Swiss-Prot record:
The keyword tRNA processing does not apply. PROSITE patterns: AA_TRANSFER_CLASS_1, GATASE_COBBQ. The gene is cobDQ. This is Adenosylcobalamin biosynthesis bifunctional protein CobDQ. InterPro entries: Aminotransferase_I/II_large (IPR004839), Class_I_gatase-like (IPR029062), CobQ/CobB/MinD/ParA_Nub-bd_dom (IPR002586), CobQ_GATase1 (IPR033949), CobQ_N (IPR047045), CobQ_synth (IPR004459), GATase_3 (IPR011698), NHTrfase_class1_PyrdxlP-BS (IPR004838). GO terms for molecular function: ABC-type vitamin B12 transporter activity; pyridoxal phosphate binding; threonine-phosphate decarboxylase activity. The keyword Cell inner membrane does not apply. Its cofactor is pyridoxal 5'-phosphate. O-phospho-L-threonine binds at H6, G7, N30, N159, R323, R337. Residues 622-810 form the GATase cobBQ-type domain. Pathway: Cofactor biosynthesis; adenosylcobalamin biosynthesis. Keywords: Cobalamin biosynthesis, Glutamine amidotransferase, Lyase, Multifunctional enzyme, Pyridoxal phosphate. Catalyzes two activities which are involved in the adenosylcobalamin biosynthesis: decarboxylates L-threonine-O-3-phosphate to yield (R)-1-amino-2-propanol O-2-phosphate, the precursor for the linkage between the nucleotide loop and the corrin ring in cobalamin, and catalyzes amidations at positions B, D, E, and G on adenosylcobyrinic A,C-diamide. NH(2) groups are provided by glutamine, and one molecule of ATP is hydrogenolyzed for each amidation. It catalyses: O-phospho-L-threonine + H(+) = (R)-1-aminopropan-2-yl phosphate + CO2. It comes from Leptospira interrogans serogroup Icterohaemorrhagiae serovar Lai (strain 56601).
Amino acid sequence: MNLPEHGGNLIELSKKAGCNPKEILDFSANINPLGFPEWLRPFLHSKIEDLISYPDPNYTSLKKKIHSKYGICTEQIVLGNGASELILQIPFVVQADYALIAVPCYSGYKEAISLLKIPCIEVTLKEEKQFRLDINELRDVLKSKPDQKALVFLGHPNNPTGVTLDKIEVLKIVQEFQNSVFVIDESFIHFCTNESSFLKDKTENMILIQSMTKILALPGLRIGICYASPLICSNISKRLPTWNVNSIAASVYEKAISDEDYIENSKQNIKIWKEKLIYDLSNLEFLNLFSSEANFILIKILDNKNIFDLTQELLIKYKIAVRNCENFSGLSKNFIRIAVRTPEENKKIIDAFSNIFYGTRQRLKSRKKTPSIMFQGTASNVGKSILTAALCRILSQDGIKVAPFKSQNMALNSFVTLNGEEIGRAQALQAQAAKILPDIRMNPILLKPSNEKDSQVIINGKPLNSMNFKDYDQYKPIAFEEVKKSYDSLASEYNVIIIEGAGSASEVNLKKNDIVNMKMAEYAKADVLLVGNIDHGGLFGSLLGTMETLTEWERKLVFGFIINRFRGAKELLKTGINYIEEYTNKPILGIVPYIKNLKLPEEDSLEFKSGALDDTSKLEERLDVVLIDIPRISNHTDIDALRAEPDVRVRIVRTVEDLGEPDVLILPGSKNVISDLNHLYDVGLVNKIFALSRNQKTDIVGICGGYQMLGKNIFDPYRIESDQGSIQGISLLQIETILEKNKSLKRVFATHIPTKTEVEGYEIHHGKTKSIGNTRVILLNEKAEELGHSDPTGRIWGTYIHGIFDKDEFRRKYLDQIRIRKGKSPLVKVQVSYNLEKSLDRLARYVRQSLNINLIYRKLGLG
């Protein structure tokens, strides 16, 4: 039986396991489980142009950096293609009479010694002493050969035991036997929390070896360093080929020297993870663990199970690789070594051990995460919300209990649940797609911009307060805890969760306190689908660019890509698809076409502000409906149902010049009524609206904030919206509004008195409005509370009800009144059903046909 000399050979391991190398969970190689530094990928890209030149054979820049950092003279530094290359040269340079090693130890020492064919004496580290070196045993050997030069190899910490040396005792023996040369291998020293390197105490007869391979998690890059006397370094260098270290490796090492935070963070995380791993392993009575100061643990199997059979079962059945230590001199045949990995990975090996030895899988204390898929985007407005709704509807159609989730939503279009709690409008639509009721747990944090700097923060459906970016950024850790609670609670009740990210996944300036994109995906253990909107242009560049800003752990979460809103022949995308799949090793999971007349409300104001929703076609025989755009518009989706009508054209107007004489003018809701009313005064629209009220042709409608603007005065005694305190309204309705501290949030069912039809919607406002003159009550809820007023003519009216036009019967009766006033025949019958169910089914049909649903289902464990 030939055992590998080293761990980490994934190619060989995967052959034995019959799987892809990426499927192997490798505990056999002692590599930093945090992965390489976040700066590595972009840094490598910046250095690619250096590959057209040979490296500096003296590695001057790197050696100067080492000298600046550690005070080591450049003549005392040799760089190697990994620490192993340097170790192999040492016996030839030292020319000792014999070698002395403490076993068990790294097999590379013996390999190097054997090349020179000098005698090798082994001092056995005793199991009963936890494999800690007894320095006197070394001393006895050295004393027994006073006229001979010894080459002593010692690991600090030692591999595979993880035990460090007693620095004081070692320095004594180094001084005592100055004719001998002591090699201190510190390849794992960076993992020791109580690091006590020999670097500052190095003597003339000492050679210090360090490796950046392990701590940087870059075993494929190869970089090692030797610190020794100028003579030894010179002689080692002469044995090495010119340019033995490539320029990329040298540049990475030079960069890493300055990144103390990465190394310290690695130490602290590994310390915590190792303690938990040791605790869990200690609860398995068939294992005996040995104390380790490194990032790996030596384990003795107390059961009679054959070690080879055990390692093979772990590999083949569980795809877990561990280091079989049978070929370590100084160890019996029942030892293995495992690396410390992430908590999730460590739990897998605990479960595997438990299952192998007990015959039953140990039950986890924490519940397994509910399967989830997350849509993230290359930018805002790429279709994340709609695709989330589509997948919710597809899963629901297939009988799977599914719910949507978005940890944090910044939008002006909110929705009020039946319990009077506020969430993003998009999550309400997604809930409908999933055929469930909207729930605040689907959107625990809602941010509603109130001015250029501040947003109202709504936590679990209730307003908290207004915060600027800095204040909210500091609050985010607390907010994320609320997010986790909501997610866990929601996920416990459903079979699948479909998560929506926010904005772009590539916002490197926002990643530190991210709670809505990759950090959320990591918490939920969600596979990420990255969405790009081909309508934006530069699709493949945006997909590739986004991937390049992601750290390695973030990239691993990305399952594949979706091309959205495509128009044209798919064959035109073939070259780009091949390029992106080859470059990223991630699949394109579908090409979703541009779907015309989808008739679903937009999530936020991006599409609205872009002008894409502005109908500038010829009016012909249609009614001309104008929505006044204001800087802090909210719930502009109130007009979506009107936009669907065949006899209506909806225009978005921002200036007096574009207004004209519409049949209906709508003042929308506002997140800051006083500020937006000031804006209307400033651009001259107030005077124009007042003039239209006199033409006997135009209906003027105010919804929520727009309703308040139509009145005589708006009072803000608590300075909720500004320091102005009050503002005069447009004075088209004899009403006054006082902005109260508490926000009114509730679903509404009411009767429109003039048409005697039922309407429904929701209230979201701070205001309390009352009539102060000649007005008519036009809307009453089931409690006979007044929810809207008009002037005596009925042409000027307002209401607090968002979604008032969504009911088909009311919308048609209202539009027919306008038609009759214009001398047109009423259409009487409902022309279009503003039925989101039909639209959602249509959306699901397109998306099901466009995506690789079978592959997505398999990822969710549903295939």
